[in-house]
């Protein structure tokens, strides 16, 4: 069947591209006959691959593969292996491609098709249709081995009906599931995709699709045929063998794959794919996007990665990367056999061809990615496949190129190789199917690859061979020859006078032969090859001082001795012109010479060093010999042998001292002769005589000829000139005329100038160098230079070698051994200066100076303290300030105290507007315990770590000072240690991580409106008595962050204590925000905001809003108006005042709100929290994660939000929203996640189990607890609790959101526990407003039911507002997302605040609270100056439940204001 289908594919005009795609299929050597088996359908299918979704293609491939398997029995057994391998590759791909859409179904689906059964089993993914069809379009069709077999399957199925149905299904799946695939991150995330999969499989998707695809493609192919344009079917070129199918799998990625999606980028699902078929039907339509996708052949399974992530990864992999591009570079070395393995990276098995094809299946980049030997030939690199399957196109193109590039022999070789490897004949592109199996099927390249590989192997080697011997043009070194002197360490024997003065134009022949070395008897070492010496002194113009350019000798005139100049030629440099003449480089420019080296036209005589010494060497004039011939020098100075190092025998140093340059005496820089001043230091040039003297070289004369220098050794060149003297101080060699060392200006020895050290006038060098530079030092060896001078002595102290004339060691000034007197016969006695030898005395310790015993710093004699550490001078009585305890009654000294400051003195410090950041007493920064005796420093802006009234304390803070609270002082303290600062009851909110007992005594008169926020991590007992003993802070916002225990009994102290903090604050109406992680006992009257992680007991006796964030146990006896307590420990809040106190406690929190003030008390307790809000006007939302008994007895309109994570007992009648994760007993509408019994309006959010029944039913305050545990909210006020535990809400309009069993009596609070509010568990709402609950709801309010309640506000929490909020059912007048009584105050508070941002803004105060916060106008007004951004209590709250209204029910309870109605709701 497959064979039957073959023709169409070949015929398709667009088939070319498709054919290339088909080529991608892996090529198997034994599959040569395979293409014959490929049917027209197969070809069509392969052509259609572009159009058909990858997953469908997989079906086809499987079918074809199955068919092919059946067709070729021999291949069938291999099929499993191949398929296995391919499947691994393919499955990985599919897994990536499928984006997790692949389902177990594939196996079953595979079985659906008998032919594809084996294939399916092998390729379960193939059958699986990924929801993202695009991604799979490419992969599946090409990838599935059945792809090639598919034609038969396709033929079996009518193209029309099945194709259409399949198409439709694909459209649905593709459009939907492509989207799904895009949108969803998991495999078959969309039902449609699964459905489609099932449908497609059941429908025999491969057949259907192949026919459908065949229709469009056959048309296109036929069109191509009709147009007689060469069309190529991948199948035509490749066999339908499974290996080909496998390669097709890989090819699929190449099919018009989007860099971002595994499949074709046709957007619009299957419909788009169909359109693509038509569009692609155009034979030569080149897909616009030919992306080089670097996709791994073996796509690793992406475990849990979502389909989207996988798509992204796949797209990235497919992207062309530098590495992939580099890999694309063909490696001619590797053989075609190796290439497939290398390329595909698949197991090196018999199926290398297949693997290769698989490799090719990937986008060209990917194929290229795998380092493929010759097979990836430049063709691949060069050609980009216009077709959707880039690889196939590339391969075809490559084949063409190969054909073009390769000779017939190469073709034959390549064919043989290919045939051996893949068993394919070299296909003609014009012939669609002639080439046979693998080349076409193999991803458009099995065969082609082989071909290319072979091709390249054949062709490239020759090319490489040609390239092997590149003809490199001689490029002169950019470096001037002068900079690259040649060092000849064997001195050639040079005959002097051999250099006849030849016109400079005559080049010196390069034939210069190395004359016998050592003929002159000179040492073997030669610095530069001897330049031909012009022994004629006449040649030397008088102007050339010490430097002569030898006239270049005509090569005819070159004598043997001159031949030595050859050596010189390379190093010869045009010194004057700074032109380096390289004989080799100049040979071309010089007159033709048979010699290998053409001599420079102008030869400069002299050593390289001479030239190096010349300023030209340092100047850019120096040109490389190649760049500038020596002709540049207009004047040729023939310097006698002076410039010839070894041959001339001139000293090495003298050559440097050539007359062409002069050395600056000051900076020793070589300057040009023409320079009158040193170019560096601008020192004037010395007269010629002086120069000669300094250089030790006279103007070169005939006598300068190195006749006598032949015996000098190499070392002689380095010997100092006669008269030079070495500075004893810096050892710099100075010229004879210098009276001072040029470096250190030390007087020359014997000049009569006083020197620190006696210096010898004698020169080190025994050699006397005459100005003629002729060194007479015979044959001194090089090592002689390093021999110790006669008479030199070694200092026994420092082992420094000293000269014989030195009476003292030049280093340590030690006396010369055996010398009694400091002076010697040849040394000048010198009186050392007071500074000691060399001024070393300066380093001596001044007389009387003393070293600090502490820091070892040397101090002056008159210093009584160390200048560094101020330590007292030894023997002097100095006051040492240690880190011990310092008790300073005056806070003026700023001490940083880490200890427990026991400030027991009546420190009535009125830090009225002191913007002090104090960690302890103002006095100082003390590390130890400090007792602060009250000093009143108003406006004292010091950075003090001792305790101020608002303390951040990490230790136990016993604040037992009565403090005079001045309402204008604002004390923010940050204490790390316990600070016994009596913080005013005014706003004392400790942030305590320990147990925090906030027993704010009701000294309201003293703390009118001071809000203290304490953050204590220890148990803090804040009992600020109104007496301003310690710190008088009145109406000051005091935020304390206490990590220890805090006993704050003075002005509102916000301790941050890590230890137990006892903050007793007597100020009422002060906002106390305490965040305590320990036990915090805060009795401050000011509204404390306690965040207690431990047990929190809050007893607020005043309507102060106390916001406590308590992480420890916190006993708040006083609850300011705004007291949010966030307690992570046991939190006991006794709210005596109508202050809303939000408590967030992670421990047991017992907020006892005793005061029926208008306090919104939000308790957020993570531990057991007892919120007893006696204030009736305080709405207390408790958010407790542990047992939370929130009983707010105060029924005023104060919204006490107790957010308790511990047990929160909020009994405040004001709206208290308790968010209880444990059991929350929230009589108030409390949101308790635990059992929250909130009798007050406080809304505790209790996460732990809180079995504390609501103490007292609060009045019309709406406290919606959010209870996740059992929540019993018996609050008459609207209590909207979100409780996950059982919540008994007996609040009037408390709506609980209870996940557990909740009894919500009056308040309709959504409770996740049992709660009157809408609960997800059983909820018994005793209060008339029954919040919709997800559990059983015993509430008069209909939950989710269309009842007729007068006012159902659309509230997510309970809304106690006189207005009827619009509900999802009936909306009377109030439209709020939470139950909110909009008071006049407009505050966007998440805690309690008079002004609330309510969506149901009926009361003046509108609060947007996430806890239940029925905003009672009075309650809203009550919060003391708390216009804060509170997350807890608030009169108006955004509550999940509605005040006695069913949020989700059409029936609305017309609850106006505090009107409590029992919603009739279903009860479970």
Swiss-Prot record:
<feature type="binding site">
    <location>
        <position position="678"/>
    </location>
    <ligand>
        <name>Zn(2+) 1</name>
    </ligand>
</feature>
<feature type="repeat" description="25">
    <location>
        <begin position="1356"/>
        <end position="1357"/>
    </location>
</feature>
<feature type="compositionally biased region" description="Basic and acidic residues">
    <location>
        <begin position="393"/>
        <end position="421"/>
    </location>
</feature>
<keyword id="KW-0862">Zinc</keyword>
<dbReference type="InterPro" id="IPR018892">
    <property type="entry name" value="Retro-transposon_transp_CS"/>
</dbReference>
<feature type="repeat" description="21">
    <location>
        <begin position="1299"/>
        <end position="1300"/>
    </location>
</feature>
<keyword id="KW-0472">Membrane</keyword>
<keyword id="KW-0597">Phosphoprotein</keyword>
<dbReference type="Pfam" id="PF00641">
    <property type="entry name" value="Zn_ribbon_RanBP"/>
</dbReference>
<feature type="repeat" description="27">
    <location>
        <begin position="1377"/>
        <end position="1378"/>
    </location>
</feature>
<feature type="repeat" description="9">
    <location>
        <begin position="993"/>
        <end position="994"/>
    </location>
</feature>
<feature type="modified residue" description="Phosphothreonine">
    <location>
        <position position="103"/>
    </location>
</feature>
<feature type="zinc finger region" description="RanBP2-type 2">
    <location>
        <begin position="721"/>
        <end position="750"/>
    </location>
</feature>
<feature type="repeat" description="29">
    <location>
        <begin position="1410"/>
        <end position="1411"/>
    </location>
</feature>
<dbReference type="Pfam" id="PF08604">
    <property type="entry name" value="Nup153"/>
</dbReference>
<feature type="compositionally biased region" description="Basic and acidic residues">
    <location>
        <begin position="78"/>
        <end position="90"/>
    </location>
</feature>
<keyword id="KW-0653">Protein transport</keyword>
<feature type="modified residue" description="Phosphoserine">
    <location>
        <position position="1456"/>
    </location>
</feature>
<feature type="repeat" description="28">
    <location>
        <begin position="1390"/>
        <end position="1391"/>
    </location>
</feature>
<feature type="modified residue" description="N6-acetyllysine">
    <location>
        <position position="385"/>
    </location>
</feature>
<comment type="similarity">
    <text>Belongs to the NUP153 family.</text>
</comment>
<feature type="repeat" description="4">
    <location>
        <begin position="782"/>
        <end position="783"/>
    </location>
</feature>
<dbReference type="InterPro" id="IPR013913">
    <property type="entry name" value="Nup153_N"/>
</dbReference>
<dbReference type="GO" id="GO:0016020">
    <property type="term" value="C:membrane"/>
</dbReference>
<feature type="binding site">
    <location>
        <position position="809"/>
    </location>
    <ligand>
        <name>Zn(2+) 3</name>
    </ligand>
</feature>
<dbReference type="GO" id="GO:0003682">
    <property type="term" value="F:chromatin binding"/>
</dbReference>
<dbReference type="GO" id="GO:0043495">
    <property type="term" value="F:protein-membrane adaptor activity"/>
</dbReference>
<feature type="binding site">
    <location>
        <position position="744"/>
    </location>
    <ligand>
        <name>Zn(2+) 2</name>
    </ligand>
</feature>
<comment type="subunit">
    <text>Part of the nuclear pore complex (NPC). Interacts with TPR (via coiled coil region); the interaction is direct and provides a link between the core structure and the TPR-containing nuclear basket of the nuclear pore complex (NPC). Interacts with HIKESHI. Interacts with SENP2. Interacts with XPO5. Interacts with RAN; the interaction occurs in a GTP- and GDP-independent manner. Interacts with MCM3AP; this interaction is required for MCM3AP localization at the nuclear pore complex. Interacts with MAPK1.</text>
</comment>
<feature type="zinc finger region" description="RanBP2-type 4">
    <location>
        <begin position="846"/>
        <end position="875"/>
    </location>
</feature>
<dbReference type="GO" id="GO:0140693">
    <property type="term" value="F:molecular condensate scaffold activity"/>
</dbReference>
<feature type="repeat" description="8">
    <location>
        <begin position="976"/>
        <end position="977"/>
    </location>
</feature>
<dbReference type="GO" id="GO:0042405">
    <property type="term" value="C:nuclear inclusion body"/>
</dbReference>
<feature type="compositionally biased region" description="Polar residues">
    <location>
        <begin position="972"/>
        <end position="985"/>
    </location>
</feature>
<feature type="repeat" description="5">
    <location>
        <begin position="898"/>
        <end position="899"/>
    </location>
</feature>
<feature type="repeat" description="3">
    <location>
        <begin position="714"/>
        <end position="715"/>
    </location>
</feature>
<feature type="zinc finger region" description="RanBP2-type 1">
    <location>
        <begin position="657"/>
        <end position="687"/>
    </location>
</feature>
<keyword id="KW-0509">mRNA transport</keyword>
<feature type="repeat" description="11">
    <location>
        <begin position="1077"/>
        <end position="1078"/>
    </location>
</feature>
<feature type="modified residue" description="Phosphoserine">
    <location>
        <position position="529"/>
    </location>
</feature>
<feature type="modified residue" description="Phosphoserine">
    <location>
        <position position="204"/>
    </location>
</feature>
<feature type="region of interest" description="Disordered">
    <location>
        <begin position="172"/>
        <end position="222"/>
    </location>
</feature>
